[in-house]
Amino acid sequence: MKNFLSIEVDRKRVFGLDLLRAVAIFCVVQGHGERLLFDTALDRFTDLPVPHGVDIFFIMSGFLIGKSFISYLESHNNRLGRQKILTFYARTALRILPNYLFILLVNYLLVHFQVIVGNTKAFPIWRFATFTQNLFTPFWDFYWESWSLPVQWWFYIFFPLFFVLLSRFAQPKKYIPWLCLFFVVFSITFRLSMADHVTNRFSYDVWMRKTVASRIENIYIGVLAAWLMHYFPKQWKRYGILCFILGIALFAATRIIPRNLGSFYHNAVYLTISALSVGLWVPLLTRWKSYKTAVGGFISRISILSYAMFLTNSLVILTMDTVCPQFMHHHGVLAYGVYWIVVLAVSYLLHILVEKPFVQLRERIK
């Protein structure tokens, strides 16, 4: 299919990071659709150890935004002006809000007309529109896939302000590690304080894994990676392979160490270690600048579609469950294939019709 239906790839993109995004969205879509493969010939593939896709997205957000702000401060005498902050906010809004609000509306309409099951009374729409649905307490039964967006949104809001405040007292090289450490300690402390709410896997998922206060640390691990890349470039390049190997080993350890419900490891540090393992992959992958094959081009285009895919995949499978339940139940492998095709098709339409026009507008804001 020619250039994946004309999705343009900017040659300035770093292919290694595109690959990481593609892996992330594969893990997310696979994770939500793997139940279709249970009790089929492909059942064994559901047990393959894969990273949490959201961990990767969090690390990527912190790394890219951190890299941008550190470079700006170093080239502007450690000063972050009002215009830079307002420009960043405008570009962020144009990147996140169109897809997010459009899919929020679609979710609401599908629930309202009983196409999918959901509860808009317990968690009103305004909380989702203001990214306050899971700041310190969880939500469920509506727009499930939105949970990670408030984590990123509030990072984007406050991160520049921290730079403005802290730059009055020190250079970024000195205060960024402490800022990152603060949020790691903050998230771990929050999870420990919420331990009484965790009585089963579901409560762990919504209280520990899907609240802003619990997951904000993951993005700051990405910021720390950006700090290391900027201030220690020789070591960043020299130890890339070693860091990648350590990251794989740490990831393997998170799959081997028992995560007993209620344990200190499970409640307090598992999410930190899991994100750190992903962060260790970044030094090597940033060295992979470009691709030379059609497969590489396809991977970069999947990376471009990843935001749309993230917001639509749960909606697709929930709608398919309602519209064709017998097909979903009795034809698992085929249904899984159809699920992927529909996710790609719907994501492409969302990207072309909603996301791309605003991204083009965003590029005019410098």
Predicted region positions:
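Membrane-interface helix-loop-helix regions
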Residues: 82-90, 96-151, 183-212, 273-282
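Membrane-interfacial loop-to-helix junctions in multi-pass inner-membrane proteins
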Residues: 11-17, 77-101, 117-120, 158, ...
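Internal alpha-helical transmembrane segments of multi-pass membrane proteins, especially GPCRs
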Residues: 58, 89-90, 94, 98, ...
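Short hydrophobic/aromatic helix or loop-helix immediately within or flanking a transmembrane segment
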Residues: 126-134, 157-158, 162, 315
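Central hydrophobic cores of alpha-helical transmembrane segments
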Residues: 178-185, 243-249
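Amphipathic alpha-helical recognition patches that constitute DNA-binding helices
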Residues: 15, 55, 84, 88, ...
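Conserved beta-strand->loop/alpha-helix structural units within folded catalytic cores of enzymes
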Residues: 17-25, 61, 92-101, 150-164, ...
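Alpha-helical transmembrane segments in multi-pass integral membrane proteins
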Residues: 1-16, 23-26, 30-51, 66-83, ...
